[in-house]
Amino acid sequence: MSCLFNSYDPYFKQPFGAVRAGQTVHLALCIPEELGYVDPHLVLQKEGKYDVPVHYRMKFDGQTPHQNHFSVDVVLGDPGLYFYYFDLYTDFRRIVRGADNCGVVSWQEGESWQITVYEPDFQTPECIKGKVFYQIFPDRFCEGIENKPMPFPDRLYQADKHAEPFWQPNETGGHLNEDYFGGDLEGIRIKLPYLREMGVDYLYLNPIFEAHSNHRYNTADYLNVDPLLGTNEEFEVLCREAAKYGIGIVLDGVFSHTGSDSRYFNREGRYGEGGAYRDPNSPYRSWYDFDSKYKGGYRSWWGFETLPEVNEETPSFVEFITGEGGVIDTWLRRGAAGFRLDVADELPDAFIEKIRTAVKRVSPEKFLLGEVWEDATTKFGFDHRRTYLLGKGLDSVMNYPFKNSVLDFVKGKPAQQAANEILSICEHYPAPAINTALNFLSTHDTERALTVIADEPANGRGREWQSGRSVTGEAYEEGMLRLRMAYAIIYTLPGVPCLYYGDEIGMQGYRDPFNRAFFCWDSHEERLRPVLAQLAQLRHSCEAFRTGELRVLRAEDGILHYQRIGKTETAEIIVNRSEHIIVEPLASGKHTEVNPMGFTIVVEENGHNPNHSYYDIQ
C-alpha cells in the first residue's frame, strides 16, 4: 500500500513544519480505493487542560488510478503544540503516524503528528543565520600571558600544556577542578587570525566570570571577569578586536545557581563576613532556600553543595540579572553578542522571557541561546510543557538531537533513521529557531567527536579507565575520515555549525575532564582545517544555508543525499559512508561521483543550469 500521509512531503502538508499563529495549514490524504468507502476527518487537538479534539471533515479532491484524494485547510490561532491524526469514519479505522513518519491504517489509538504553532512576531537575529561558531573553554585554549601568578592561593598552575587535566579525587573523594592551564582572553585575542582563517564568525565562550574552579560554572561574581582570564577592560578590547575580524562573542550565563564560594553566598568566607550563608540579613539571602531538610542546610543544584540553587523568581535576583544596568545589560554593552543560558530547561519560562526582554532591549540582533538536550518543543518542566521556543523566550537551543543522529550515522546507523530524526527536529522547531540552532559534534559536556567515532565506548566506566586513552594507527585514520563526513553534514544542515576547540586537529577525550585538555598548538594534524575553511566559505557564499528548506532525496545503504532549497540557490549534498565509489543522480538529472567516506556538494542557481558553483571535497 502506498503512503497515505507523510508530513515531511509537501504533497501531504504545506507549509512544512511549524507555523506562525494565524497561519493556514493544508493537509492532504491519498487513500487507496481498496479501503472502500471512507469519509475522512482531520482530528486536531491543542495541548491544554481544557482543550478537546476538533473534527474537520476533509473535502474530496478527485481520483487518480486506484486512489482517492482528500484535503482540508485549517487555521491554527494560538501558540502551542497541536497533535493530529485522521479518522476515516468507517469501521472505526483511523490513520496514525507509523514508521518513517508515514500514515498507517489502525483500529486502535496510535501516535499522532505534531504541529508547533509559535508567536506571529517571533524573529531571531539575521546576523546569526548562515554563520559559523567556535566554542572555547577559556582555561584550555591559549595562554596569551605566560607564567602569570595565580590570583588566589588555592589555584594550581599547570605549566605543562600537554599534561592531562587532573582527574583523581582529593582526600575527601571530591573533584575541585582546581588545576589551571592559564588560558586567557589575551590568548583568544592572539588567535583571532587563526579563527578567522577557518571562517569563524562567532565565539561561544564557556563562563568567563570570576569563579573558583577551572570550568567557572560556580559563579562568584557576575560583573567581573575572572582575574586569571583578564579584566573587564581586556574583555572590551577583545570584543573590539574580534569585531575587526567580523567575529562576535557569545557568553555563557549560569543563572540557575551560583557558587557557594561567591560574594552572594560566601560559605567559604573568601568574601568577608557578608553573603547569604553567613549573614541572615544579607541582601542575597532571599535568593536561596535555607532549610534543614536539605543536605548542608540549603537547596543545591543536583545535590552539589558547592552549587547553591537560586530562586529565579525572587524579584531582587530577577532585577539583578535582567534589569537596566543588570548582568545581561552590562555584558552586552561591554561588547558581547549574546548569551547562552546554562541548563535552560531548569529556568522558569517567565524568567527566560525576562532575560529575552533584557537582551532585545539592547538590540534585536543580540542572540539568546539555551542549553536543552532533547527536542525543545516537547520538554516538560515545572509541571507543564515548556514554552521557551514559541517566540517569547529563547531564540534557539543547542541542537543535541542533530549531534546524536550525525555521529550515529557516520558510525553505521541506517541513513533513513538518521534522516527521520533530523527531519523531526526540523518539523517541530519554528523556522526562526531551527535556522539559528547551534549544531555541534563535541562540547565540554560530551565526549569528543573523534573519541565517539573511533574509540571504545566508555559504557559507564570511570575516570581511571578513561585516563590516557586515545586511538592511533588505522583506527585514527578511519576516525578522521568519518569525522570529516560528520562535519560536512553539520555544516550543511539547517542551523549554524559550532566547532569545539581542538576538534579541527583531531583532539580526543572522553567526558569531563578529558574532553577539556589544553589545545595542542604544536599538533601536525592539518587535514581537517582546510576542509572546515572550505565549508565555512561555502556557507558564507550560498544563501540556501541561511534559511533554505531541508529536503531529503535519498537515505539508504549508507548514502545520505539531501538538498537545502533557498530563494535563489539550491545546494545538494551527498554523503557516502560506504567503502566504494558511488555515482549518484542529482536533482538536475546529471550524475556525480562520490568517493568512499567522502561527500560532494553542488550549488546551483534556481532556474538556471547547474554547476553555478561546484564543490567536491574528496
Label the predicted regions.
Residues 14-16, 26, 553-586:
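Carbohydrate-binding surface patches
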Residues 29, 36-48, 53-54, 82-84, ...:
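Beta-strand-rich binding/interaction modules
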Residues 31-33, 592-618:
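C-terminal beta-strand-rich structural cap/linker in extracellular carbohydrate-active enzymes
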Residues 139, 382-383, 435-471, 487-525:
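Aromatic/acidic polysaccharide-binding cleft in carbohydrate-active enzymes
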